[in-house]
């Protein structure tokens, strides 16, 4: 089972050895060295996440470490979100399969969360004890009234929960751990460290592009799946508001990435007070790479916030730990319209 270990994940020499080890004819019956096996499993996990394969894929610590460096080197928001969600679900499954309480305690400890099964137990279904602050932080990200603090037994600063609730809390803490750890690795450092597998990285990127483009084209046009930021920009444009350059760039690049053609994008800007169709078409061609040679990607959520273009309000999906990009929101909604 996975036991999160930030020190191991950030061990560049370990990661370099995993990346550099070549297939050997000895040591394993299948002809793979241990490091090569780790590398193979890590790439397979990321690719399965990219392709939307929701089958349970158990992974170990070293594989998880290499997966993080793959994500850092790729630096693709949707690939990162999908992979971490798949890892989250894998962790939850493993937590539900543990045979010893101590394993959950150790898992929580690795994430800085104190869990106890030795304290007073209130009711046969409430086996685990966790601090109120930790519970409130992570349980708030789980959908369902069952996981609300108001529906738990609370005593003297601790919450008493059953195994199901605890697994959900720990999986969300794991998501935070993954993003926090990933943020400590610079893309340039990741590329240099695992440069011997750049071809494999490109294969993952190509798999993503193919799968992503098919899904986007199939689902384009359903604006109900757009994130709140894009809906707000569209609403302002329709009302004749003079939307900022960054807002227009964000919308045009979002629509392009969502599979919209130039002719389909132009109408969104017709009510802008300074609308000029020739200029608008030129800018769309520039954003799409037809003129510039560089295809623009819409800004990340962090950039949208810093430019006062984030309108998440109470949208629960926007508040998910892994939600870092408007396209990620759209992709997730495409797969499951009811998700919150």
From Swiss-Prot:
Q: Pfam family of this protein, just one? A: DNA_primase_lrg
- UniProt keyword terms in alphabetical order: 4Fe-4S, DNA replication, Iron, Iron-sulfur, Metal-binding, Primosome
Q: Recite the UniProt cofactor note for this protein.
A: Binds 1 [4Fe-4S] cluster.
Q: Could you tell me which InterPro entries the record lists for this protein?
A: DNA_primase_lsu_euk/arc (IPR007238), DNA_primase_lsu_PriL (IPR023642)
The biological processes this protein is annotated with in GO are: DNA replication initiation; DNA replication, synthesis of primer
**Entry's Gene Ontology cellular component terms:** primosome complex
Cofactors named for this entry: [4Fe-4S] cluster
Q: Which GO terms describe its molecular function?
A: 4 iron, 4 sulfur cluster binding; DNA-directed RNA polymerase activity; metal ion binding
Positions contributing to [4Fe-4S] cluster binding: 229, 301, 310, 318
The family this protein is said to belong to: Belongs to the eukaryotic-type primase large subunit family.
User: What quaternary arrangement does the UniProt entry report?
Assistant: Heterodimer of a small subunit (PriS) and a large subunit (PriL).
Describe the function of this protein: Regulatory subunit of DNA primase, an RNA polymerase that catalyzes the synthesis of short RNA molecules used as primers for DNA polymerase during DNA replication. Stabilizes and modulates the activity of the small subunit, increasing the rate of DNA synthesis, and conferring RNA synthesis capability. The DNA polymerase activity may enable DNA primase to also catalyze primer extension after primer synthesis. May also play a role in DNA repair.
Identification of the protein by name: DNA primase large subunit PriL
Q: Which organism is it from?
A: Thermoplasma acidophilum (strain ATCC 25905 / DSM 1728 / JCM 9062 / NBRC 15155 / AMRC-C165)
The gene designation is priL
């Amino acid at each position: 089972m996975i036991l999160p270990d930030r020190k191991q994940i950030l061990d560049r020499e370990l990661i370099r050895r995993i990346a550099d080890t070549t297939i050997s004819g000895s040591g394993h019956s299948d002809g793979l060295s241990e490091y090569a096996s780790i590398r193979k499993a890590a790439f397979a996990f990321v690719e399965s996440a990219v392709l939307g394969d929701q089958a349970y894929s158990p992974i170990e610590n070293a594989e998880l470490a290499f997966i993080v460096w793959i994500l850092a080197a790729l630096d693709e928001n949707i690939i990162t979100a999908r992979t971490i969600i798949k890892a989250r679900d894998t962790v939850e499954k493993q937590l539900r399969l543990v045979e010893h309480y101590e394993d959950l305690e150790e898992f929580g400890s690795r994430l800085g969360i104190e869990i106890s099964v030795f304290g007073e137990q209130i009711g046969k279904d409430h086996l685990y004890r966790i601090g109120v602050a930790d519970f409130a932080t992570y349980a708030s990200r789980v959908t369902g009234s069952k996981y609300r603090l108001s529906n738990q037994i609370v005593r003297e600063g601790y919450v008493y929960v059953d195994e199901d609730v605890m697994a959900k809390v720990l999986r969300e803490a794991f998501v935070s751990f993954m993003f926090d750890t990933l943020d400590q690795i610079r893309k340039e450092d990741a590329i240099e460290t695992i440069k011997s597998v750049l071809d494999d990285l490109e294969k993952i990127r190509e798999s993503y592009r193919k799968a992503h483009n098919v899904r986007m084209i199939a689902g384009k046009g359903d604006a109900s799946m757009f994130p709140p930021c894009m809906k707000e920009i569209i609403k302002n444009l329709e009302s004749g508001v003079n939307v900022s350059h960054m807002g227009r760039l964000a919308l045009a690049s979002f629509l392009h990435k969502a599979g919209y053609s130039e002719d389909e994008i132009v109408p969104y800007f017709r009510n802008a007070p300074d609308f000029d169709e020739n200029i608008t078409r030129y800018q769309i061609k520039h954003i799409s790479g037809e003129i510039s040679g560089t295809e623009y990607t819409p800004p990340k959520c962090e950039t949208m916030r810093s430019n006062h273009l984030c309108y998440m309000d109470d949208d629960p999906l926007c508040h998910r730990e892994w939600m870092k990009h408007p396209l990620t929101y759209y992709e997730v909604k495409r797969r499951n319209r009811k998700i919150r």
